[in-house]
Regions:
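Gram-negative/organellar outer-membrane beta-barrel architecture
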Residues: 1-81, 150-151, 155-162, 166, ...
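Short, glycine/acidic-rich beta->alpha junctions
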Residues: 12-14, 96, 100, 207
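C-terminal outer-membrane beta-barrel translocator/porin domains of Gram-negative envelope proteins
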Residues: 41-183, 192-195, 199
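Predominantly the C-terminal beta-signal and adjacent terminal strand-loop region
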Residues: 122-128, 145, 206, 218-247
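Short leucine-rich amphipathic alpha-helical surface patches
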Residues: 181, 197-199, 215-223
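Structured catalytic core of nucleotide-sugar glycosyltransferases
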Residues: 187-189
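A short alpha/beta connector and helix-capping loop motif
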Residues: 204-216
């Protein structure tokens, strides 16, 4: 059970999530089957725009496969992570809905490690709903920020709402290419290009691009990343700091 209260891109939400799951780890694949319940209040502060309360009771299944040689400094390997879920019609839910989301990444380092590491990442998701306004925003998608499309503020890519807010959308697509080149034993430089969008469907998407460079410090505790990126859409330069590897 978890309770989360947050305001991001001028969207305020309070969400309670609980459920029961059966977890199984077999042949390196972690799978989960369960029943989840989400209830959420959403509004845009200082406006009359109140999305009210929505809730969803969903049967969910998720799979995760991770085959990375060294997690503290990934050089070769891949990860796959997917989740699907659906309500039983509108039973204990604001509306009938189904959701699918997945992310994946691939790391490749040539035998001559001085060449560096090439990384490809991707994310995709979609929510089908009978009544779109009744879907909890926690189940929909926004993107932008250090873990998705760099060069943009956190969750700033989505549907434009009132008072400068950014509201979540039903479809998500994100891709990233990165090259890391060694500087010292524990330090690497990086160049990258990210792209992505969140829209009502995939046909309506207009990819937002971000290009930049950064530094990676592979400490004994966790990797530390500092990036500077240019957001092509709004023509601004932003910096990002993150701790840990993006799995």
């Amino acid at each position: 059970t978890s309770y989360n209260r947050s305001t991001t891109q001028n969207l305020e939400k309070r969400a309670l999530t609980t459920g029961i799951w059966r977890v199984r780890d077999r042949n390196g694949i972690e799978s989960r089957l369960g029943l989840e319940f989400i209830t959420e209040d959403r509004k845009v502060p200082d406006t009359n725009y109140d999305l009210g309360r929505s809730h969803a009771t969903m049967l969910t299944a998720s799979w995760k496969r991770q085959n990375i040689e060294t997690e503290l400094r990934p050089e070769n390997g891949y990860y796959l992570d997917g989740k699907i879920g659906a309500t039983l019609g509108s039973l204990f839910s604001s509306t009938a809905m189904a959701r699918a989301a997945a992310k994946a990444g691939y790391f490749f380092t040539p035998e001559n490690k001085k060449i560096g590491t090439f990384i490809v990442r991707g994310q995709a998701g979609y929510v089908y709903a009978k009544e779109g306004k009744e879907v909890p925003s926690s189940l929909e998608f926004r993107t932008g920020g250090a873990s998705s499309v760099r060069g943009y503020e956190l969750d700033s890519i989505g549907k434009a709402g009132p008072n400068g807010s950014v509201l979540p959308e039903r479809a998500l697509l994100v891709g990233s290419l990165e090259y890391q080149f060694p500087l010292t034993k524990s330090l690497s430089g990086a160049v990258f290009h990210d792209m992505g969008d969140a829209a009502v469907n995939f046909k309506k998407m207009t990819m937002k691009h971000g290009t930049g460079l950064g530094v990676r410090w592979f400490s004994p505790v966790a990797p530390f990343a500092f990036d500077i990126a240019y957001g092509h859409q709004d023509k601004k330069i932003r910096w990002h700091i993150s701790l840990g590897t993006r799995f």
